[in-house]
């Protein structure tokens, strides 16, 4: 058949590129793992992983670094998806941080994120002896991610040096590393937030319902709407929890993640909203505003 008779949408091309990258990782690395944070990008990655190796089960496990402060609904969704898909899931909690009672309320966003997420991830990768960790970061999210390679090399201490990365020519990736080094791989690098939602709509991928607008109890704090997800969130003097129509564009630890006021309760509504919004999804991440806690500095220390 004449190749000119084929028509590929931009989503088809993005899907093909991501599946190629996933297969390349499995072929080139000794012990890869997929970082599953339970968000929309992770949900797309899991769907692509299942597609890439169907009808066989995925040949690599999923890894979730649990800070113990994720939204309750995220954990319930994670467990349901693992049961539905049959994938192997590893859950890691930084027990040293637990022993120190590290939390975002008492210790703040920067300390909590560093100990429970960054150090927790480094522990999990070392314990599992993983040489490649697949993540869902995209270049449109934030300026430091915009300059990161698809194959992002980390030294033996998991540190990222943005000035010491390898060139990537077309779809040719260099997977050679020295003992102790590792690579973070980002198959969704060339996707946008809108692409992710269009693909979720086309493929009917399940996502956490927190992405859809609904009346939820929130307090306004530091210019953000914080969901009162459980009794661990203390109200400040004068604060009152109110039901407001909100949804989340990004998900993380609930005291550090701001909701946005919205009536987008369906995938079609979310896509329509994405077409007109002028703001980045990371406007709702409190950690990005912490002094000395820029995304680049966190990534240099080993962050996702």
Curated annotation (Swiss-Prot):
It comes from the Bacteria. Coiled coil: none annotated. It catalyses: sulfate + ATP + H(+) = adenosine 5'-phosphosulfate + diphosphate. Pathway: Sulfur metabolism; hydrogen sulfide biosynthesis; sulfite from sulfate: step 1/3. Keywords: ATP-binding, Nucleotide-binding, Nucleotidyltransferase, Transferase. The keyword Transferase applies. Signal peptide: none annotated. GO terms for molecular function: ATP binding; sulfate adenylyltransferase (ATP) activity. With CysN forms the ATP sulfurylase (ATPS) that catalyzes the adenylation of sulfate producing adenosine 5'-phosphosulfate (APS) and diphosphate, the first enzymatic step in sulfur assimilation pathway. APS synthesis involves the formation of a high-energy phosphoric-sulfuric acid anhydride bond driven by GTP hydrolysis by CysN coupled to ATP hydrolysis by CysD. Belongs to the PAPS reductase family. CysD subfamily. Heterodimer composed of CysD, the smaller subunit, and CysNC. This is Sulfate adenylyltransferase subunit 2.
